[in-house]
Regions:
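Metal-ion/cofactor- or nucleotide/acyl-coenzyme-handling active-site neighborhoods
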Residues: 1-219
């Protein structure tokens, strides 16, 4: 685990949703098949990056995670800004640091911590090598925007996680299975089984992750 200089503010989330269930909405192709299921209304709802393309989901979110391509895709930037300004009830968190450096210095196009704060978001730090079960002391593994919220909500005490639109790729809305991403999913499974053996993970309409967790078909 890699110590973080920037994640101490995440301490407020320790066991914040202890014993509750959550849905993570990613934007792989199967997001288009999603429909609410029994018990979904009571779940904590987390949306990722381009989930704004699905307003019926966005308007019910409790958390929104974003960061990449903020300065390289103006339409994307404007839609992030809109979520942060028009949905004050959504707690937004931004991937704004990586391995001890601000994304202003890194220059890859991710949002800077200063801009994240202007939008009312919580900037946090990722790394490229290890997951953590103490997100306020150590940086979370990045590589994909799906991994930080997984580490965050386990830290929050969530005991059941539904994965929607987590199809094993980096490209929103189209099939784009990535072996790199699947490698980190495998690492996540090992991390989760070691540090959080009790919480249950359920893949809704799984594709690349079929058989990795509990599978469920919801249409």
């Amino acid at each position: 685990m890699i110590e973080s200089k920037f994640n101490s503010q995440l301490k407020q989330f320790k066991d914040f949703h202890k014993g509750q269930s959550a849905i993570i909405f990613a934007t792989g192709p199967t997001i288009k098949q999603y429909s609410p299921f029994e018990g979904s209304e009571e779940c904590i709802k987390i949306g990722l990056n381009r989930i704004y393309d699905y307003p019926q989901i966005t308007e019910d979110l409790d958390y929104y995670y974003y960061g990449s391509h903020y300065y390289t895709d103006n339409a994307h930037k404007q839609k992030i800004d809109k979520i942060c300004s028009e949905y004050p009830n959504i707690t937004s968190l931004a991937s704004a640091f990586e391995e001890g450096r601000s994304h202003e210095v890194i220059g890859r196009g991710n949002i800077t911590p200063e801009r994240a704060l202007e939008l009312g978001s919580i900037p946090f730090e990722n790394n490229l090598s290890s997951f953590t079960n103490d997100i306020s002391t150590y940086s979370t593994l990045g590589h994909s925007i799906v991994f930080p919220p997984l580490q965050h909500i386990l830290y929050m005490g969530i005991n059941k996680i539904y994965l929607v639109g987590c199809d094993g790729g980096f490209t929103s809305g189209v099939d784009s299975e990535s072996q790199e991403l699947l490698f980190w999913w495998k690492e996540f499974v090992e991390f989760k089984n070691k540090h959080y053996p009790k919480p249950q993970i359920i893949s809704i309409n799984p594709v690349s992750l079929k058989g990795w967790f509990h599978d469920a078909v919801v249409k």
